[in-house]
UniProtKB/Swiss-Prot annotation:
It comes from the Archaea. The lineage of its organism: Archaea, Methanobacteriati, Methanobacteriota, Thermococci, Thermococcales. It comes from Pyrococcus abyssi (strain GE5 / Orsay). HAMAP family: UPF0216 (MF_00585). NCBIfam families: PRK04115.1. Belongs to the UPF0216 family. InterPro entries: UPF0216. This is UPF0216 protein PYRAB16100. Pfam families: DUF61.
């Protein structure tokens, strides 16, 4: 079974090659002439300035410095019917984008039904990515 698990992990890593090597803060990206990051496969990902400005309009200065982009929308092998967003600021942004009410307590993990994924990606195509997560 160990060999099968290694093969699955290799394939998941290949599928996730579009993920960033490192994420950058919204603040840093706004200060760049051409906002971009390098992906795991060596290619470059550019952010639309209009999207960055939309995100900045939803947050205060401290949150702008804290928000790391692109936001990762996790698709798990365990909770296949959900997407998971990690981080208080990230969760706050997604709630606002979807028009949800302000949370009384800001939770660091937001779990949403998977059918929200296309809507989020349609609104934030360059500032979000989806990642496939293998959990045994």
């Amino acid at each position: 079974m160990e060999r099968v698990e290694r093969i699955i992990e290799f394939e998941i890593a290949r599928i996730n090659s579009h993920l960033p090597r490192a994420r950058k803060s919204l603040k840093d990206l706004l200060n760049m002439e051409e906002p971009m990051i390098t992906l795991r496969d060596g290619s470059v990902h550019y952010f639309k300035r209009q999207e960055l400005e939309l995100l900045a309009s939803l947050l205060d200065e401290e949150e702008i410095a804290m928000l790391r982009l692109p936001m990762v929308l996790e698709i798990s092998t365990v909770e296949r019917d959900k997407i998971i967003i990690r981080g208080k600021v990230e969760a706050k942004v997604i709630r606002k984008i979807l028009g949800f009410e302000e949370a009384i307590i800001e939770e660091p993990i937001l779990k949403l039904p998977r059918y929200y994924l296309p809507k989020i990606r349609r609104i934030l195509p360059t500032t979000t990515v989806h990642a496939f997560i293998v959990e045994w």
